Amino acid sequence: MIMCSRGHWRPAEDEKLKDLVEQYGPHNWNAIALKLPGRSGKSCRLRWFNQLDPRINRNPFTEEEEERLLAAHRIHGNRWSIIARLFPGRTDNAVKNHWHVIMARRTRQTSKPRLLPSTTSSSSLMASEQIMMSSGGYNHNYSSDDRKKIFPADFINFPYKFSHINHLHFLKEFFTGKIALNHKANQSKKPMEFYNFLQVNTDSNKSEIIDQDSGQSKRSDSDTKHESHVPFFDFLSVGNSAS
């Protein structure tokens, strides 16, 4: 029983195999294996026809050979030894490996058009988002109309109108309810009213209020005086004198 070595072929073994094939011819592989300890006849034959045979065509496959290879595979399937006979100088492994190369190439070619639409759509989506963000029209949850209803222009620009005053004082009055803000959506178009906490023209307002109060007091005094001048008739005294 011949023990077979499962390792790679060494250069010294390749040279000895070439000498034996030249001596015995590429036929009697069992006799050749006896001269190579650890190698079987099948191993010697495969090593010769796949690697060492000088008739092996090591040039790249041509387009004509590729078409013939695909046609032969449609007929014979994965019978690579039969297919290799149709290609002089090509080994079983050569035709098998190149068929897989052709299939991988076709897979890449067919998959490229499928990736283009998604890439284009993603790039166009990113471009549109950048345009919307640059123009100020981009929002996550609200449309432009809803944003106007919820945040009127006066409310958004409100802090900037009074940026020269004490912000702490402003916030205190804002949260204590001294500043009235209208958040109703149906009244968003109406102008918002604020108390004039800057104390502008407060004296004139006070004077108007005092004048109004004084006018009312004068009218009440005149009414009381008018009532005091009404003549009083003593009907009881008239009755007593008649009796």
From Swiss-Prot:
Where does the record place the region Disordered?
206-227
**Does this UniProt record's set of keywords contain Nucleotide-binding?**
no
Where is it localised? Answer: Nucleus
Question: In what ranges is there compositional bias, type Basic and acidic residues?
Answer: 216-227
**Which SMART domains does the UniProt record give?**
SANT
Q: Keywords, A to Z?
A: Cell wall biogenesis/degradation, DNA-binding, Nucleus, Repeat, Transcription, Transcription regulation
The keyword Manganese appears for this protein: no
Q: What does the record say about tissue specificity?
A: In elongating stem internodes, expressed in developing protoxylem and elongating interfascicular fiber cells. In non-elongating internodes, expressed in developing metaxylem cells and interfascicular fibers. In roots, expressed in developing secondary xylem.
Query: Per the annotation, which location comes first and is thus the protein's main one?
Result: nucleus
A molecular-function term among this protein's GO annotations: DNA binding
Domain of life of the source = Eukaryota
> HTH myb-type domain: which residues?
1-52, 53-107
A GO cellular component entry from the record: nucleus
Report the Pfam families cross-referenced here.
Myb_DNA-bind_6
List the CDD domains hit by this protein, alphabetically.
SANT (cd00167)
Q: Which residues bind DNA?
A: 29-51, 80-103
GO annotation (BP), single: regulation of secondary cell wall biogenesis
| Other facts | Plants silencing MYB54 exhibit secondary cell wall (SCW) defects including severe reduction in SCW thickening in both interfascicular fibers and xylary fibers of inflorescence stems.
Function, in words: Transcription factor that regulates secondary cell wall (SCW) biosynthesis, especially in interfascicular and xylary fibers.
Protein's name in the database: Transcription factor MYB54
**What's the source species for this entry?**
Arabidopsis thaliana (Mouse-ear cress)
